Amino acid sequence: MSDQGFPRRQRLLTAGDYQHVFAHASFKVHGKGLLVLARPNALGYPRVGFVFSKKNVRRAVDRNRLKRLVRESFRLQSHRLPAVDIIVLARRGVDALDNATLHRQLHGMWRRLEKDVRKQSVASTPSP
């Protein structure tokens, strides 16, 4: 069976992990109702965490649906993502989007993040 799980090592688990990304976010990707913050890590694989507050997503059922969709989207795209720590933040109005729209939007956000990280790594690599 292929490695399609979502192991603990791919999650931001501690408050320190979150603080590190919030304090030193190198990349921001905006979408309708979502914001992705990311920072390179030295682990060799991407990790993700979520911030879906009651203020922005009122009902628990909607917060859980969003977490499930983002987690699944990340799981399917993680093999393409560079080694970064990612935080996905919900903004107001995201709970009004349907699942298909969210899935398309997340796919585009992962691609933009991948492109931005590649662009920065190429720019920071000195030429011979």
UniProtKB/Swiss-Prot annotation:
GO terms for molecular function: 3'-tRNA processing endoribonuclease activity; ribonuclease P activity; tRNA binding. SUPFAM superfamilies: Ribosomal protein S5 domain 2-like (SSF54211). It catalyses: Endonucleolytic cleavage of RNA, removing 5'-extranucleotides from tRNA precursor. Its EC number is 3.1.26.5. Keywords: Endonuclease, Hydrolase, Nuclease, RNA-binding, tRNA processing. It holds the Pfam family Ribonuclease_P. It comes from the Bacteria. GO terms for biological process: tRNA 5'-leader removal. It is an enzyme of class 3 (hydrolase). InterPro entries: Ribosomal_Su5_D2-typ_SF (IPR020568), Ribsml_uS5_D2-typ_fold_subgr (IPR014721), RNase_P (IPR000100), RNase_P_CS (IPR020539). GO terms for cellular component: ribonuclease P complex. Belongs to the RnpA family. Consists of a catalytic RNA component (M1 or rnpB) and a protein subunit. This is Ribonuclease P protein component.
